[in-house]
Amino acid sequence: MAKQLVFDESARRSLERGVNAVANAVKVTLGPRGRNVVIEKKFGSPTITKDGVTVAKEVELEDKLENIGAQLLKEVASKTNDITGDGTTTATVLGQAIVKEGLRNVAAGANPLALKRGIDKAVAVAIEEIKKLAVSVEDSEAIKKVAGISANDETVGQEIASAMDKVGKEGVITIEESKGFDTEVDVVEGMQFDKGFINPYFITNPEKMEAVLEDAYILINEKKISNLKDMLPVLEKVAQTGRPLLIIAEDVEGEALATLVVNKLRGTLNIAAVKAPGFGDRRKEMLRDIAAVTGGEVVSEDLGHKLENVGMEMLGRAARIRITKDETTIVDGKGEQAQIDARVNAIKGELDSTDSDYAREKLQERLAKLSGGVAVIRVGAATETELKEKKHRYEDALSTARSAVEEGIVAGGGTTLLRVIPAVRKAAESLTGDEATGARILIRALEEPARQIAANAGEEGSVIVNAVVGSDKARYGFNAATGEYVEDMVAAGIVDPAKVTRTALQNAASIGALILTTEAIVSDKPEKAAPAMPQGGGDMGGMGGMDF
């Protein structure tokens, strides 16, 4: 396919038009008085949302060059959302402001590369200031506030804080759709994995279709068990204690499974068997996690263990085990805390070094199962459209709460970005030429989120910004929800996670500065429409004038 090439100012202005198209649609959602955006869907009801990244993802422009600019700004929103789950609208507004101010200076003759260096240096200073202003999150009240602001709903904040209280800050919290109108929080205590009983004859409670083992031993075997002779010694030892036994293995089959079922039916031994969770290397690690929680050892050929030689000291213990057809929950395992902590620290080390989102998600699941438990928030609503929108807000609020726990909170409402301006201005004074201009571009952009929040609340943005910047109180700001100035935004509960503010600024500056240094665009040339098919003759040639 033929390509079209566009250069210089024409290329940059095309990108700017695309950036503006996305930003103008997204920024109306910013702040407590931000408006909704309705998104048409090809199938089903339209989506109504106040989430910046959802709006940004739907924007596709007809002009190919402008669409490239739109895609670049969408990347800012998506990247910010992937890392923190919030701050997408702030990032979009910052990106638009950097592009607008930057291109004005490039058109006036400034060196784009020097501007980029100045912006990068100013961003580094701003991030250090944000870290200094951050306050660590110690209690559920702060989590409630930050999650409530993200969702624009105090009830959402309350439920997220309640769930984090129950399962711990490292715990797994999942958001699901409820079949009813009400939203409820269910907490699963202990370690849960998604494998159920191998055979329904292991069920102890036919009404609930579940097997419950009290004060049970746990045999954790890495390989399949099919030979009865290998398993017989450990079965005899457990039978002498009179306690139940759970077998976790890659699989249990053949005569081994038949013997277990027969012993269960005769009442000789209260026993159940489940398949090991996960696959490959992840399965090995998950079995070691279970061993740490229960105080047992994994029977592994890699470590020189053989099933026929397993002693009672290698078996794990748990106060209660509940098994359904789909999942197994181990409550109150008897493992030593030191071993569990060692596993937790090892997983945290892997989390820091991995680049894969999928691997990170699985590691966080393992971490949560070791740390406390799993909470499920089932979101209810009257209609499907409301349910989708509400579920999305819960997901955003949860990500925001996690970010707050990670790096602390700062004053919200765009206040923190205004508070870092003096430090950036001081840094700009040490720069020269176009680098200093680049730093000043960032200073102007830092004002934009507060301006937009005020504008969406029906106030004059410049007046609000000047009033906040003019105050010598570090947390003085404007509460757009009430239209009043606040002495201490953090005390008033108007907060943002420091990680969200930092990530939004970094991503916006990254894409904004790249657009300034663009000198040419190569894109597909629009295809000419194919000529229309010629119309057929009136009398259809020699068909003899067919009559109808």
Curated annotation (Swiss-Prot):
Its EC number is 5.6.1.7. InterPro entries: Cpn60/GroEL (IPR001844), Cpn60/GroEL/TCP-1 (IPR002423), GroEL-like_apical_dom_sf (IPR027409), GROEL-like_equatorial_sf (IPR027413), TCP-1-like_intermed_sf (IPR027410). GO terms for cellular component: GroEL-GroES complex. It holds the Pfam family Cpn60_TCP1. It comes from the Bacteria. It is found in: Cytoplasm. GO terms for biological process: chaperone cofactor-dependent protein refolding; protein refolding; response to heat. It catalyses: ATP + H2O + a folded polypeptide = ADP + phosphate + an unfolded polypeptide. The keyword Cell membrane does not apply. Keywords: ATP-binding, Chaperone, Cytoplasm, Isomerase, Nucleotide-binding. GO terms for molecular function: ATP binding; ATP-dependent protein folding chaperone; isomerase activity; unfolded protein binding. Transmembrane segments: none annotated. ATP binds at residues 29-32, 50, 86-90, 413, 479-481, 496. It is an enzyme of class 5 (isomerase). Forms a cylinder of 14 subunits composed of two heptameric rings stacked back-to-back. Interacts with the co-chaperonin GroES. Together with its co-chaperonin GroES, plays an essential role in assisting protein folding. The GroEL-GroES system forms a nano-cage that allows encapsulation of the non-native substrate proteins and provides a physical environment optimized to promote and accelerate protein folding. Belongs to the chaperonin (HSP60) family. HAMAP family: CH60 (MF_00600). NCBIfam families: GroEL, PRK00013.1, PRK12849.1, PRK12850.1, PRK12851.1. This is Chaperonin GroEL. It comes from Deinococcus radiodurans (strain ATCC 13939 / DSM 20539 / JCM 16871 / CCUG 27074 / LMG 4051 / NBRC 15346 / NCIMB 9279 / VKM B-1422 / R1).
